[in-house]
Amino acid sequence: MNFYRKIATVLVLLLTAGWLKSPWEAAAQKNFVAAGLLSPPLDVATKEKIGQTCAAVALGGMQSVVATFINLAAYGSFEDRDWPKLEERYNLIVALQPKSSYYWDVASWHLSYNAAVDYREREELPAARREALHKQYIQKGRDFLDRGIQNNPQDWTLYSSKGRNYAHKDKFPDFAVAAESYRLAWQTGKGQRTFEARAWLYSLARVPGKSQESIDLARELFRNPQNRVDSIRCLLFALEWQAKGERTMEDLLAQCFEDHKTAAEMLRLYHQNNADQMPQDGVMVAMQWLKEQDGKQ
């Protein structure tokens, strides 16, 4: 009898200890999740979708392993052009690994680029249906980026991908959104991302009513020799032309280019290759002026 009483006492003590430490463990887990040291616990729907075996592995702290295997399966969906299944699988992946920007980015790329283009080119579908699916999957990809940013607000790569998506000429561009996304990419990249800084300017310059902000940014970027690429030089010239006041052509060209020959060649290519519809203010006038100056020599 004493033996069973001891067993009962031990069980009561264990249950009491578990009950007492449960709030502490829950609070500790919450803090670890907030700090990014642990993945959030799986919800019931996710457990059901990945199956009992995978759920057991994930609960054992190996959610990244499960996500990797599902990612391999998602590649099969890509090869089969089964876009709904691919979307479903990436929703599972990001539920398992919400702090991995890679999965958010790849999911967005598959949906906004691969799926959207595939649906647009499926000749067996009516034209209206193709266009609707094309737009729908572009937005699905954008939604993945937004959710990824919510989970990883300090990751510059997702902001950069969002900027690239919204600036793409074939994806119903919104240059205001693109400019802000690139600005945040540059900011979260601690000001070291020169490509994102230039992309910020390219987008901002195409937003109506943002001429002053664009020229201020262009001047700031041009102070850094790394940013003095051909397109920045030409864009700065076009923006300076808008605000030139009493300044002469010679002054404007000298500010943006090293010499007349370089200016003529860069402006010619900038004007000729303008599929992205960058500002062209003063470009034709400058090209004609440079041609006349060359003829005088």
Predicted regions and their residues:
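Short coil/linker segments at helix-helix boundaries
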Residues: 23-155, 160-187, 198-204, 212-216
